[in-house]
Swiss-Prot record:
Keywords, in A-Z order: Acetylation, NAD, Oxidoreductase
Gene responsible for this protein: mtlD
Superkingdom, taxonomy of origin: Bacteria
PROSITE patterns, per database record: MANNITOL_DHGENASE
UniProt family annotation: Belongs to the mannitol dehydrogenase family.
Protein name: Mannitol-1-phosphate 5-dehydrogenase
Principal EC category: oxidoreductase
Known EC number: 1.1.1.17
Length: 382
């Protein structure tokens, strides 16, 4: 089996690329970073530090790389069995034209073996969004062929991969946590379902997407925002602060109550999942900076994201949300000189006041009870 993976960054190398290569799949990375491309093509291998209770070093081998903006990537799409991405939500639109060209070439070459494309991004149904961009870039006469022969498979991914400065200045070395979860929608594949260790197939993807968003992402963000306010440097430092831990755990329990109601999750199993996530935040090997995790607060405070979406669920089912409100208030306080969204957030609050600013960012009604609760909590933190 041959695969092409867009994005040779830390997540690409440390998570999806590693799983594919470990499964014995012939893997090519596509990226724009020439330093990384040259290193991959010179060595065809790299090291991954897997850290949890203990630390181990795995070597990923037998890989190569092409530029994601050259002709080679188009040729590969015409030949491979699987295309995956870990490029970030914004970049999906940028890689769509190359994918479309590759699919046209595949059709012209008469290659009718099924191709499956899986976007492994921190977003809900990212592959469906990528499909929209690809279809827009395709000529009309290729669209029906692509619908017939190409599967666009949505997925949910979970592994903490912080940016790590390699002690050896190796551009390929990467550190990841032991835990990883890659869940894909088995109803969207073309051809035979793949058997890749570490890839879990489900016919109920949204339950897993929301479980991760409402627990890992909600908890991670609130830990970062409260941690930054309290002067902590890392996620570990923040979650070991008992006051912060109580709010984070409380928020994950509030969002969890929504999941249990919505998807009939087992309450005990979900409580264990929350405990496991708190343990991941404590990982001493992951130097996960609160400022990195907190960045892009406007996106994280938007209606479909990790803070407001679970809050809307609590309103839908009439459930408590005190700790989620604390997290939202802390997010409104997030300041970072390196993050344009943090600066935009500060300017918006200064210009409109916290009530109107939160309503504009989140889509919540400015006169609603929850906005007033969040504003009260926000002011109490000043």
């Amino acid at each position: 089996m041959k695969a092409l993976h867009f994005g040779a960054g830390n997540i690409g190398r440390g998570f999806i690329g590693k799983l594919l290569a470990d499964a014995g799949i012939q893997l090519t990375f596509a990226d724009v970073n020439q330093v990384v491309l040259d290193a991959l093509n010179a060595r065809h291998s790299y090291q991954v530090h897997v850290v949890g209770e203990t630390e181990q070093v795995d070597t990923v081998s037998g890989v190569d790389a092409v530029s994601s903006i050259g002709d080679d990537v188009v040729d590969l799409i015409a030949q491979v069995d699987l295309v995956t991405t870990a490029v970030g939500p914004v970049v999906l639109e940028r890689i769509a034209p190359a994918i479309a060209k590759g699919l046209v070439k595949r059709k012209e070459q008469g290659n009718e073996s099924p191709l499956n494309i899986i976007a492994c991004e921190n977003m809900v149904r990212g592959t469906t969004q990528l499909k929209g961009h690809v279809m827009n870039a395709l000529p009309e006469d290729a669209k029906a062929w692509v619908e017939e022969h190409v599967g666009f498979v949505d997925s949910a991914v979970d592994r903490i991969v912080p940016p790590s400065a390699s002690a050896t200045n190796d551009p390929l070395e990467v550190t990841v946590e032991t835990f990883s979860e890659w869940i894909v929608d088995k109803t969207q594949f073309k051809g035979t379902l793949p058997n890749i260790p570490g890839m879990e197939l489900t016919d109920n993807l949204m339950a897993f997407v929301e479980r991760k968003l409402f627990t890992l992402n909600t908890g991670h963000a609130i830990t970062a925002y409260l941690g930054k306010l309290a002067g902590h440097q890392t996620i570990r430092d923040a979650i070991l602060d008992e006051k912060i831990r109580a709010v984070v755990k409380g928020a994950m329990e509030e969002s969890g109550a929504v999941l249990i109601k919505r998807y009939d999750f087992d309450a005990d199993k979900h409580a264990a999942y929350i405990q496991k996530i708190l343990g991941r935040f404590e990982n001493p090997y992951l130097k996960d900076d609160v400022e990195r995790v907190g960045r892009q607060p406007l996106r994280k405070l938007s209606a479909g994201d990790r803070l407001i979406k679970p809050l809307l669920g609590t309103l839908e089912y009439g459930l408590p949300h005190k700790n989620l409100i604390e997290g939202i208030a802390a997010a409104m306080h997030f300041r970072s000189e390196d993050d344009p969204q943090a600066q935009e957030l500060a300017a918006l609050i200064a210009d409109k006041g916290p009530q109107a600013a939160l309503a504009q960012i989140s889509g919540l009604d400015a006169n609603s009870e929850v906005v007033s609760e969040a504003v009260t909590a926000y002011k109490a933190m000043q």
